[in-house]
Amino acid sequence: MVSVNENALPLVERMIERAELLNVEVQELENGTTVIDCGVEAAGGFEAGLLFSEVCMGGLATVELTEFEHDGLCLPAVQVTTDHPAVSTLAAQKAGWQVQVGDYFAMGSGPARALALKPKETYEEIDYEDDADVAILCLESSELPDEDVAEHVADECGVDPENLYLLVAPTASIVGSVQVSARVVETGLYKLLEVLEYDVTRVKYATGTAPIAPVADDDGEAMGRTNDCILYGGTVYLYVEGDDELPEVVEELPSEASEDYGKPFMKIFEEADYDFYKIDPGVFAPARVVVNDLSTGKTYTAGEINVDVLKESFGL
């Protein structure tokens, strides 16, 4: 079984070697942990965002720049492609670890989750485990972690602090915009497993595109814009060893199947009293899905791109 941590390490090493060209800053904490600043104090950039995203997916996907053009709205976009959908998205990329140490808080995603089993149920459902000696965690935060945070993460992962790598980017940064849009395939797999309770190991290949949100001036607004890029601008193509349930599952898969669909995410969040648990989890999904049943050769589609909500979200 491939290790998502060991597989992502060459990408991390490439980021360290090319730090100046990527506009990222590398520092070693006193306990030996390596921190790669991709947008807190460093500028970051598109290439750093693409690498950040590939690291987050355990090196089991390619993330490339493309273009989104729909009904007069033109934006840069990402194209995500993986031949290991369940592992790259749910075992690695999913933002399933709330890292809180003292006053520090970050959403943790990436390969290190597989060592810390955050959350354990996900790994049981997709039958995946990792036992690497190195841990790589991607943190969505506007603050850089210190030694206490690193010690906590290393301890949870069962690795020495000097074998821990922490990549950090705020939501309101170019790397933040890129890496959230690169979760377009992940949202499809997430909804299949967590909401529709479908066996995601049946998904054999996946690719998807989503526009990259204009960078906002604060993390709150950025959270809304980046989510909208997937909910209203994302398209995912899944290749599935299907069953009799698949046609009905596809109809429920896109974001439009949710009762919360149809308005910018920040409005949804506001109406939920800023409580994520009051939001219908079914809205966290791509706008449009195309599913090829490998067992029958049939193809099913559902959902559509909603440019009007994207424009409202971006203030256009």
Curated annotation (Swiss-Prot):
Pathway: One-carbon metabolism; methanogenesis from CO(2); 5,10-methenyl-5,6,7,8-tetrahydromethanopterin from CO(2): step 3/3. It is an enzyme of class 3 (hydrolase). It is found in: Cytoplasm. One of its GO terms (biological process) is one-carbon metabolic process. Gene3D superfamilies: Methenyltetrahydromethanopterin Cyclohydrolase, Chain A, domain 1, Methenyltetrahydromethanopterin Cyclohydrolase, Chain A, domain 2. One of its GO terms (molecular function) is methenyltetrahydromethanopterin cyclohydrolase activity. Transmembrane segments: none annotated. InterPro entries: METHMP_CycHdrlase (IPR003209). It comes from the Archaea. GO terms for cellular component: cytoplasm. Keywords: Cytoplasm, Hydrolase, Methanogenesis, One-carbon metabolism. Its EC number is 3.5.4.27. Catalyzes the reversible interconversion of 5-formyl-H(4)MPT to methenyl-H(4)MPT(+). Belongs to the MCH family. Homotrimer. This is Methenyltetrahydromethanopterin cyclohydrolase.
